[in-house]
Swiss-Prot record:
It comes from Streptomyces griseus subsp. griseus (strain JCM 4626 / CBS 651.72 / NBRC 13350 / KCC S-0626 / ISP 5235). This is UDP-N-acetylmuramate--L-alanine ligase. It catalyses: UDP-N-acetyl-alpha-D-muramate + L-alanine + ATP = UDP-N-acetyl-alpha-D-muramoyl-L-alanine + ADP + phosphate + H(+). InterPro entries: Mur-like_cat_sf, Mur_ligase_C, Mur_ligase_C_dom_sf, Mur_ligase_cen, Mur_ligase_N, MurCDEF_pg_biosynth, UDP-N-AcMur_Ala_ligase_MurC. Belongs to the MurCDEF family. Cell wall formation. Gene3D superfamilies: Mur ligase, C-terminal domain (3.90.190.20), Mur-like, catalytic domain (3.40.1190.10), NAD(P)-binding Rossmann-like Domain (3.40.50.720). Pathway: Cell wall biogenesis; peptidoglycan biosynthesis. One of its GO terms (biological process) is cell wall organization. One of its GO terms (cellular component) is cytoplasm. ATP binds at residues 117-123.
Length: 466
């Protein structure tokens, strides 16, 4: 039932094809039969998975990687103007398409669900994708992380539903025309692109305004930014607004979240009836993500009890409190949290799941601009751990900002009473953690950069007894 290949996407070339967002689009196009090619900075499991689908993936960036017959070049906001393949596209007059436009073209003609918000997008999108798949609806989906079960971040489904993570960081979420939009929260982040909360609200209002006539906005009734957004858009014509959360007036009210070890039991009140289901990750914030997914599915006309049962099929997404393993009695868990709100939520979730365990964090700040604006709050969040190791800032797409280092976070953490250590060389982290950890402890590798690679190395070091 799903559409075929958009004309401009028959022979696409992706610059940075290994990225979470780019690889998902490339996978769907390859599954639809497009001749996909691209390049990435380094070899990866993602590159191999794309090759398995028939894509050509080059390692490194060079003008010669771009085929003369490419129908378009797909880029994300992270690609610099001096990239040799992008310059070559200009010489060949090959159209350049932003990642968000490519995704929008794949969603055309389908019942789209776009999941937006400062935090929780990947988890909520994943929960929806798993639940809808479990119900036999064969959705297409594009997610910012790999699902634990299928082991992929995207797939082309034969059904008429497309679930997509909608990125607000560069305003690209304004390109979509969803039937259902989810807004989990609205906070100031991405400081290089937004100067104020007013700019954030304006951007989200534009996103909500793109919902198709008669469509539905599913929005948090608890988070202050989301509540303010609801106030601003509630009177838009031909828009249904469904709120969810603990607030007494929420349309889908969270009645109770009960921790059950590394899972949670969630009870909601919907249309005057109580409904209870299990979420296989700990923490109230993940329970609320599941309720948002439930509300979105109901907005599409799917029975709530079916969705509640199907949400139990969700087993997690990589890097979202993902258990990496255990050695010497120490569990190592990977967290993608990189904003103070996310950091606090994940630490509180782990504290609730394992109240007697010591929690040790290996934190890698993400982006100089974010550290400049939120470094103090990051340090305060780390005070919820029993001890922390803080690495140097992961720059991603940014150039350094003079005077902005991890010391901002470390100083704030110490001011808040935290036990914190700076480690500048990642090679020294496994030994540093082994020197701190004892049997029964939990170690969280936390951040949006390559800190995730340290989990297996920490486990190896612990197992060796060095």
């Amino acid at each position: 039932m799903a559409p075929g290949i958009p004309a401009a996407m028959e022979r696409p070339h992706f610059i940075g094809i290994g990225g979470a967002g780019m690889s998902g689009i490339a996978k769907i196009l390859a599954q639809r039969g497009a001749k996909v090619a691209g390049s990435d900075a380094k070899e990866s499991a993602t590159a191999e998975s794309l090759r398995a689908l028939g894509a050509t993936v080059h390692i490194g960036h060079a003008a010669g990687h771009l085929a003369d017959d490419a129908s378009c070049v797909v880029v994300s906001s992270a690609i610099r103007a001096d990239n040799p393949e992008l310059l070559r596209a200009g010489e060949l007059a090959v159209p350049v398409v932003h990642r968000s436009d490519a995704l929008a073209s794949l969603m055309n003609g389908l019942r789209a669900i776009a999941v937006a918000g400062t935090h929780g997008k990947t988890t909520t999108t994943s929960m929806l994708a798993v639940a809808l798949s479990s119900l036999g609806l064969a959705p297409s989906y594009a997610i910012g992380g790999d699902l634990e079960g299928p082991g992929t971040n995207a797939t082309h489904g034969e059904g008429d539903i497309f679930v997509a993570e909608a990125d607000e960081s560069d305003r690209s979420f304004q390109k979509y025309d969803p039937e259902v939009a989810i807004v989990l929260n609205v906070e100031l982040d991405h400081h290089a692109n937004y100067a104020s909360m007013d700019e954030i609200y304006d951007s989200f209002e534009t996103f909500v305004g793109k919902i198709v006539p008669g469509g539905t906005l599913v929005v948090s009734a608890d988070q202050p930014g989301a509540v303010e957004l609801t106030r601003r858009v509630r009177d838009l014509s031909d828009l249904k607004v469904v709120t969810y959360g603990c607030a007494e007036d929420a349309d889908v009210r969270v009645h109770k979240v009960t921790p059950r070890g590394l899972t949670s039991e969630v009870t909601v009140l919907l249309n005057g009836k109580f409904l209870t289901f299990t979420v296989s990750v700990p923490g109230a914030h993940y329970a609320h993500n599941a309720v948002a997914a439930l509300a979105a599915g109901v907005a599409l006309g799917i029975p709530a009890h079916n969705l509640a049962s199907a949400l139990g099929s969700y087993t997690g997404v990589k890097r979202r409190l993902q258990l990496k393993g255990e050695a010497a009695g120490v569990q190592v868990i990977d967290s993608y949290a990189h904003h103070p709100t996310e950091m606090t939520a994940d630490l509180e979730a782990m504290r609730g799941a394992a109240a007697d365990a010591r929690i040790l964090v290996v934190f890698q700040p993400h982006l100089f601009s974010r550290t400049q604006e939120l470094g103090t709050e990051m340090g305060q969040a780390l005070a919820r751990a029993d001890a922390s190791v803080v690495l140097d800032i992961y720059p991603a797409r940014e150039d350094p900002i003079p005077g902005i280092t991890s010391a901002l976070i470390i100083d704030a953490a110490k001011e808040a009473g935290a036990e914190v250590t700076a480690v500048h060389d990642q090679a020294d982290v496994p030994a540093a953690v082994a020197g701190m950890a004892k049997s029964g402890d939990l170690v969280l590798t936390m951040g949006a950069g390559d800190v995730t690679d340290l989990g297996p190395r920490i486990l190896d070091h612990l197992a060796s007894g060095r």
